[in-house]
Amino acid sequence: MKVVLISRSDLRGGAAVFTFRLMVALRNNGVDAKMLVVEKLSADRSVMSYANYFQDKLNFLLERFEIFIRNGFSRKTLFHVDTAHYGRDISEHPWIKEADYIILNWMNQGALSLRGVKRILELGKPTIWNLHDMWCLTGICHHAYDCNRYTQDCGHCPLLKSNKYNDLSHRVWLSKSQLYRYENLHFVAVSNWIKEKCRQSNLLSQHPVSVIPNSISLSAYQEPKHEGLNQILQDIEKIRQTQSQILAIAAARLDDPIKGLPLLIVALNIFKRKYQTNIHLLLIGSLRDESWLAKIPNDYTFTGPLNPNEVFAVLHHVDVVLSTSHYESFGGTLIEGMLAGCVPVSFDNGGQRDIISHQQTGYLAQYPSADDFADGIKWALASKISKSVLENTVLSNFGADVVAKKYIKLFDRISHNATTQEGVSR
């Protein structure tokens, strides 16, 4: 069985990392899986870049310019939306030609256009589209926030500051609506929350959507060797000697509005007022505006950006891992934290519900109650959940082999259904 996974990158961004892990997991389970990307960062021979620097740069710039002139020349929302109007046609690539199954992943920003997806679907091969966020079920946005226009046919897009029905979001919505008519296209959501959103979406409400989570594997992490990291770990051990318990929050950009940093600060203030507990917060990731640090009411360490191996190494020294995201498709940092032995605390408003069993393997606070989140921190610090229970919970639900076998079952089901339909048509 030959499978090709398509992604913009193999290692840059959460969706890319999870796609790379899926490829490795499928290979470890006997599937001839390969990965086609624009940006190749790994040395894995099963990953090939189809990049053409000039063409890819031009596609990227053309798409950003199209969005920029339609969103009121706002940089603020420039990367909150994608149109997939520009991208490569890779339907003639040898790996695509050889494939029995094709898996589409995060392929925006000029990597693959909707026309390119159409050309792949025209090959007639079973094609699975993994839904890492809401982009496939909306016109152009990756997260709809409080907008419910995706339950109709978009238009009047708030991210474009549009007062027009036939705006860019509606036109892309129409293109997707035509594309989704192909019977060889199948959708997989990475969480039940994404599937719920699909049921609400006018684009996908009538399409079957399977749920297969992202995977994680202990073997995916390598022992990092970095002097700066060693200093961070030494500092954590010194903090331990002050009897402080250690919390951590990690994100590529901590003050991305979707990550809910203001909510976390409110919750920490409530925690400080209600409970006499020494805590130390680790902030892992970048900050565009470091003035946020002055608003944190307790001791903290700002590590700056760390790579996945370094984040995982740090989490082994943490008691509680936090997420205050307003929207979370899956919650990769939570499962990484649990695998490292951290008790997770998060809101109950997204894919976190697939990860945490409330007050059994973590705490799900009622969104958006900062009070309840503060209580969740207290509960987690007092809990006696063993690290082995947390690790086993992750591996039994999100382990690489578990997830790979779910995909193999999906391949078999698609093949069986196709054979049955052929028999009926005869």
Predicted segment positions?
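A short, well-ordered alpha-helix in the C-terminal region of glycosyltransferases
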Residues: 385-400, 406-409
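Short hydrophobic beta-strand element within catalytic cores of glycosyltransferases
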Residues: 343-346
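Carbohydrate-associated surface elements
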Residues: 193, 215
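Conserved donor-binding/catalytic core segment of Leloir-type glycosyltransferases
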Residues: 188, 238-259, 265-268
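Nucleotide-activated donor-binding/catalytic signature segment of Leloir-type glycosyltransferases, i.e.
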Residues: 285, 290-309, 320
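Short alpha-helical donor nucleotide-sugar binding micro-motif in glycosyltransferases
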Residues: 306, 313-318, 407
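Conserved acidic donor-binding segment of nucleotide-sugar-dependent glycosyltransferases
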Residues: 358-359, 363-370, 378-384
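Aromatic "clamp/platform" in nucleotide-sugar-dependent glycosyltransferases that forms part
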Residues: 326
